[in-house]
Amino acid sequence: MQMKTIRGLMALLLGSLVLNGVRADDAPVRQTPQPINVLLVGNSQCPTIVRNKMLEKLAESDQGARPIKVGGCIKGGASLRSHWDAGTGAGTARAMISGGAWDYVVLQDIYNVQEPAFQPYARQFYALIKETGLQTVLFGTASILSDYPKGFERQHRMHLAMGKELGVPIVDASQAYFRYFGETPSTERLESLFATDKAHPGLWGSYLYACMIYSSITQRNPIGLAAPEAIPADIARTLQETAWAQHQETAAALKK
């Protein structure tokens, strides 16, 4: 008798759910957020970021953030000019941008570029990116160590001016390097962000770049997010803090 009563109550409950438009097998569906698709157009300053999936891992460790997928058109020694002059064949930067499979295109020029070579190609790439419905981020790397500090200052000046002109975010990595170095850096401090050739970023420098790119794209704070195991925890924290502080300063400068 008791079992019949329980079954009767269950039937009434299921009937009520159906009458109210709720199916018994309905369950909340957890939607996976759409990834942010990022194309890096650059040269040998970028491979460590791509190879180590630094941007993807930052996003994965950031609770509530969208995942990131990264593609690259990366050629050793390339400039924006050489990327543009490569034309529109398969695998070129222009072809990849025009394919429209991206949300952001990060443009990185060669370390020793001067304004007459930088400005027209930054503008042309920006126009193509905008026409395709994508968003541009200008990535100003640090210069080579032997060009410190003048080359760093040149990179900062050019990218800030172009960022203001085009109304796009910039990754002002040269200023972040200055911030990390401090007022009177030792040789060891200066070399710590570079590879052994003192021209390309080492693991620490690449991670600083990645944190800045992440913040420029997402406007999110990288402090406390994932870092390569080979970077000591205290150094990773300092690099994250440096990236976030510089991102905020640069974002404010672009509005002036």
Summary of predicted features, one role per range:
Residues 22-26:
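Boundary at the C-terminal end of the N-terminal hydrophobic targeting segment
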Residues 1-10:
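Bacterial N-terminal signal peptides that target proteins for export
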Residues 35-40, 45-121:
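Conserved SGNH/GDSL esterase-like catalytic core that processes O-acyl groups on lipids
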Residues 93-203, 207, 211, 215-216, ...:
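Alpha-helical cap/lid subdomain in secreted, periplasmic
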Residues 9-18:
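Bacterial N-terminal signal peptides
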